[in-house]
């Protein structure tokens, strides 16, 4: 009895009943195609074809020899070069080697800073410190000229208003309250000192006496500063009182600081109300 003849497709399928067919590779021009077989999530046999673009480049001899090193472990039977299943190629990092002579020439071309010279210069007040450390950052007192002009205008307005009314002005209000001795001193009566006192509110909790003095010292001389603090925490309550020596300076402080920003807050400056 003659053996039954089978088709070549049945023979190929019979050879790989227990396994998957081997992968196949072929090239076409500058493209390389790799066909692989695997089982998908449903248990079905599928064919996966990967396409690679072949690029030729010149590499150093040590790099070429390193690519031909014998592999080991799970990659023992892999071909030379990286395998996509076990190796992931990251982006190339190009190194530039500079000799010490080129580095010295680059350093010689850099501008030299004179020793002992302060390179810090504030762009707000032109002081010898960085702008980030300027006490007048974010306020209307960013310019000394602007502050002086506002103070002069406020003082002139206060004097002109008093002269236009034609009413009687007591001696301690004339010339900024300097009828005797040139100003309102600490020993003056409380109701006299309150004529040149202002109340500054909406201050931050981190406000200190030093910050308050820095805020008002360029406006005019003052005789007393009071910063309200919490008893337990010692933090600022949000308001303070400043007693200026001259009334026109107090008016200038209201004109300059009221409604302007300080420490990310909008200040409210007004005349201090007499205590009952």
From Swiss-Prot:
Swiss-Prot/TrEMBL keywords: Cytoplasm, Initiation factor, Protein biosynthesis, RNA-binding
Name assigned to this protein: Eukaryotic translation initiation factor 3 subunit G-2
GO terms, molecular function: RNA binding; translation initiation factor activity
GO cellular component, one term: eukaryotic 48S preinitiation complex
SUPFAM superfamilies: RNA-binding domain, RBD (SSF54928)
TM stretches of this protein: none
Described function: RNA-binding component of the eukaryotic translation initiation factor 3 (eIF-3) complex, which is involved in protein synthesis of a specialized repertoire of mRNAs and, together with other initiation factors, stimulates binding of mRNA and methionyl-tRNAi to the 40S ribosome. The eIF-3 complex specifically targets and initiates translation of a subset of mRNAs involved in cell proliferation. This subunit can bind 18S rRNA.
CDD domains for the chain: eIF3G, RRM_eIF3G_like
BP terms from Gene Ontology: formation of cytoplasmic translation initiation complex
Assembly information from the UniProt record: Component of the eukaryotic translation initiation factor 3 (eIF-3) complex. The eIF-3 complex interacts with pix.
SMART domains from the UniProt entry: RRM (SM00360)
Subcellular location: Cytoplasm
UniProt key word Lipid metabolism: no
Keyword Cytoplasm: yes
Membership in a protein family: Belongs to the eIF-3 subunit G family.
Domain RRM: 196-274
Source species of the chain: Drosophila persimilis
């Amino acid at each position: 009895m003659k053996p039954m003849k089978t088709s070549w497709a049945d023979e190929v399928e019979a050879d790989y009943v227990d396994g998957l067919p081997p992968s196949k590779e072929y090239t076409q021009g500058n493209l390389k195609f790799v066909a692989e077989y695997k089982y998908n999530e449903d248990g079905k046999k599928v064919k996966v074809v990967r396409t690679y673009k072949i690029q030729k480049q010149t590499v150093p001899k040590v790099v070429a020899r390193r690519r031909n090193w014998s592999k080991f472990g799970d990659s023992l039977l892999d071909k030379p070069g990286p395998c996509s299943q076990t190796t992931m190629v990251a982006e190339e990092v190009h190194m530039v080697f500079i000799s010490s002579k080129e580095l010295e020439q680059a350093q010689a071309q850099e501008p030299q800073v004179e020793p002992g010279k302060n390179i810090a210069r504030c762009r707000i007040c032109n002081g010898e410190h960085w702008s980030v450390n300027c006490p007048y950052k974010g306020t209307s007192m960013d310019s000394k000229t602007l502050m002086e002009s506002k103070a002069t205008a406020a003082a002139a307005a206060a004097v002109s208003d008093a002269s236009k009314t034609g009413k009687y002005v007591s001696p301690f209000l004339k010339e900024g309250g300097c009828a005797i001795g040139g100003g309102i001193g600490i020993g003056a009566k409380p109701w006299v000192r309150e004529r040149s006192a202002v109340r500054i509110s909406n201050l931050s909790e981190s406000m200190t006496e030093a910050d308050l003095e820095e805020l008002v010292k360029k406006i005019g001389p003052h005789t007393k500063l009071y910063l309200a603090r919490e008893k337990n925490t010692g933090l600022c309550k949000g308001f303070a009182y400043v007693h200026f020596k001259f009334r026109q300076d107090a008016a200038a402080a209201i004109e300059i600081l009221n409604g302007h920003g300080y420490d990310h807050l909008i200040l409210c400056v007004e005349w201090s109300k007499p205590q009952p």
